[in-house]
């Protein structure tokens, strides 16, 4: 499993501003007009983890290396994207290459910033993107179904089983049900789903981009999204892109902390977003530490201790004999 999250949304919802703040770069053009991003921009960020800092102090480590997560800034989708509107097919293909989806929503009013739908309604915006992902998946699964139907004429039992699963997927998509909401799959179904790479099977979190004054507790629009996300079984994070852009310009952590304190914020919204992305990918962390460095390592959840050892060095996976738990909680 890869470790990357695609940042998606309608055009001009400040995705690129968030991406630039996340990666502390200006790699993605951010402008007040749709489709200022065409090609996806990629950047890696460290996952904030207080445990690693504590361990580095205990080990007197010279260097601290955090777990890394890749974010991909993908151009905005519009109605009809699944039919090619606004270069939609290209952008949907970019999303298909990611492991999880971070859906950025505009949750603030500002007459100086245009909205492609000409009004601020985040739930409507969610439904627009969801519809395009569903339609793209349905087109993809129908192609797979036609291909399997031809092969099934040979009487191959395995092909027939695959065809049954594909038909089940298609029926859910036709009902308007994202695949991630449907859990009645057996192990073989899960494997086929994984290989099918459905957009709506990817884990998802909503990011509510609010005005500066609402960064601490959100606003009426973000609360609508929080309610929707809870019913949807998805996560929700409140962020002010304007604040995050300012923080990214500060050099020292002390300056950042002081700035956050003046705004009544305990931490940067992007830290919450990074952790949410990490959680979406179903990852776990383990640590190594010594005088030279303290490092966080990343593994898929339910990995074994030998697999973890193999991340450090391939020989360790073959020769690991024993592992003990820490004597103090982290």
Describe each model-derived feature in a short phrase.
Residues 194-198, 308-312, 316, 328:
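N-terminal cationic and glycine-rich segments that engage phosphates or anionic surfaces
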Residues 266-320:
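Functionally critical, mid-to-C-terminal surface segments that flank or help form catalytic/ligand
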Residues 213-287:
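Canonical P-loop GTPase G-domain recognition
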Residues 88-238, 243-244:
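Conserved C-terminal guanine-recognition region of P-loop GTPase G domains, centered on the G4
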Residues 75-77, 115, 123-129, 149-155, ...:
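Short hinge/gating elements
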Residues 1-85, 89-95, 101-103:
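Conserved G1/Walker A P-loop phosphate-binding module
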Residues 321-330:
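Single conserved hydrophobic/aromatic residue that forms the stacking wall/gate
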Residues 26-33, 57, 155, 175-185, ...:
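Active-site phosphate-binding and catalytic loops of NTP-dependent enzymes
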């Amino acid at each position: 499993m890869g470790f990357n999250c695609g940042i998606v949304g309608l055009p001009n919802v400040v995705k690129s501003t968030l991406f630039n703040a996340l990666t502390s770069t200006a790699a993605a053009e951010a402008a007040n007009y749709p489709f200022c991003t065409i090609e996806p921009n990629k950047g890696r960020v460290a996952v904030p983890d207080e445990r690693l800092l504590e361990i580095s102090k205990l080990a007197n480590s010279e260097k601290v290396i955090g777990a890394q997560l890749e974010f991909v800034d993908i151009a905005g989708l519009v109605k009809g994207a699944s039919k090619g509107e606004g270069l939609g097919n290209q952008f949907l293909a970019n999303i298909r290459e990611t492991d999880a989806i971070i859906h950025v929503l505009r949750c603030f009013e500002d007459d100086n910033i245009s909205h492609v739908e000409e009004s601020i309604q985040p739930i409507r915006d969610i439904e627009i993107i969801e519809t395009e992902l569903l339609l793209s998946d349905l087109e993809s699964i129908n192609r797979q179904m036609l291909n399997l139907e031809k092969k099934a004429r040979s009487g191959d039992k395995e092909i027939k089983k695959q065809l049954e699963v594909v038909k089940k997927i298609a029926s859910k998509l036709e009902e308007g049900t994202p695949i991630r909401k449907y859990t009645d799959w057996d192990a073989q179904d899960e494997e086929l789903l994984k290989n099918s790479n459905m957009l709506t099977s990817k884990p998802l979190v909503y990011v509510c981009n609010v005005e500066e004054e609402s960064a601490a507790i959100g606003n009426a629009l973000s609360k609508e999204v929080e309610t929707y996300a809870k019913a949807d079984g998805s996560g929700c994070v409140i962020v002010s892109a304007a604040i995050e852009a300012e923080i990214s310009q500060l050099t020292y952590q002390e300056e950042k902390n002081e700035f956050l304190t003046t705004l009544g914020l305990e931490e940067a919204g992007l830290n919450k977003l990074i952790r949410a992305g990490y959680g979406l990918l179903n990852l776990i962390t383990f640590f190594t530490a010594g005088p030279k460095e303290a490092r966080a390592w990343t593994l898929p959840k339910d990995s074994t201790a030998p697999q973890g050892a193999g991340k450090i060095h391939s020989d360790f996976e073959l020769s690991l004999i024993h592992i003990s738990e820490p004597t103090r909680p982290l």
